[in-house]
Amino acid sequence: MVCADIEGGISIFRFTNVLLLIDGSEATTLDEMQQTLRAIWAAEQPVPWRSGTMEAMARFLRSLRGRQDWRGNVGKRAWVAAKYVLRCLTLLRGHLDFLAQIEGEPALLAFRRRDPRMLERHLHRYLTRGWRRRQRLDAIRWHYHHALAAMPAAVFRAVYVEGIARLGLLMLKDGGHLELGLRPPIVFGCEGELCIQIGDDSGNPLYRVVVTVIDADTLAIGCIQGPDGGDARETVRALTRNLHGLRPRCLMLALARALARHWGLSRLLAVGNAAHPLRNPRRRFVADYDAYWEEQHGRETGDGWYELPLHPQRKTEADIPSQHRSAFRKREAVRIEAERLLSDAMNAMPRRHRQHEAHAVEPDFGPLLHGICAEAS
């Protein structure tokens, strides 16, 4: 197994050198590159444990295509591509397995076309500053393994391919509505893989919580974020009044808890201030997550996370002064309706994973190389 990893790394490194030569030298032709790749492929055939190397190389090559997240001129994109390759080599076997997972699921492959950054989120800061690349990759792979099995196919596609799954409307005090939806992570996002969002009548996002299923038992919260801008504070106040006094971030936390319970997960973690991936010692970190998690009876775990109760103790109507009971009932009605909309969206029969068997054939690198060179020109 170790030999296979080493040989796979050497093959991809040799292939990357060819790719960089083509980028830097006008004298190198596509035909010459294809001949080089075929020679590598032919040289690897006699050894049985190398049989999957060229297929992995082909996947790796495809991961360099359609990279609209690599911006700038040709030189800058080539430099970003080179860094991507070198980072991949530090986690070669895991990264190649991830590429195989993506190409083995049509819905994931469609999401990769929409957001190519998903190919390398684990190679950058992600979810918590305390994780290494292997932990980031394991969490991301587990999330999509779980989401494909637990989310109805139509909902998964709406979220990750079309960009939003609209779950329904919540009635506000002034007669208006909030739209509850699910979204994929933002471009260059580092706080998680699934966004639960409320927005206004016009579709503008107001509040969101970003979550990730990081293992068989755990849902992790990477952020709870409200509106920004100069009038953000007043927007939150107005929204709280329209929710009969229910704070929007409490509604978002309730939805994260509801999702974890619906999916049968037993732990809810939330990242603290010090471990947040966007924390910068040279810049003030605006959100005070620690205070909010402690307010919500979170317990610090000692590794940058807070563990939150999945079933918090809630006040009953008897605990509320009589003059405030009407507003309390309305707040609870909004929360319960939001949780119902989320659960109803997830209630269809889970989609089972399909097993794909790969057959070793000599790959045709021509169309792939033409595509890459066309994008780089």
Regions found by a protein language model. Give the residues of each.
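Short, contiguous, well-structured surface segments enriched in hydrophobic/aromatic residues
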Residues: I221-C223
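Conserved acetyl-CoA-binding loop-helix of GNAT-fold acetyltransferases
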Residues: A238-T240, H244-R257
